[in-house]
């Protein structure tokens, strides 16, 4: 009799250029990262596989290491999935690493796991075509120290309802931001935010508000006012996706 393979859960770390995709999550009217991964896995294993991602990134957003899992009975060694999938994926999606995790391991519901996002701003007099895909262009001078002063109000546990899209489909809008660092090197400003989780559009709205602080439209204290208002707001004009 044929030996039945054991179901295993495989974890993958996925990097991608999101420019040509309608985000992570499968959409009826656009190509997504999840769809490409599912199709590659189905071709590889001959199983009907659906990946579960840690971060459902928006259209145009990039990733260096989005974590996802899938269940399979395939005998392929866990560490070989990365190589095998990369042969079947477009060049703008790469599985950096693969390993096996317990069957109850879920990328979104693990204790003591943090997520880090970076938002890149290219701040110069004229755009740089080599930066356009991965940075948001701002031609006006930016006060980085003012941005840092405003960012301090966002660190800690807060109700971030003012910093999420009105389409956010959760009742619990409390999140903890562990760190929000703003670095400037040459013509590039990088906002690096680490937290226990993020609401829909939260990082892009944080970036949008801090860009306004940097340009002098808002005082740093305005960040606290927006946070304390606890209402969905468009004041932070969501920053474009390509910088994330």
Task: Set out the residue ranges of the language-model regions.
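Structured-RNA-binding interfaces characteristic of tRNA pseudouridine synthases
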Residues: 2-244
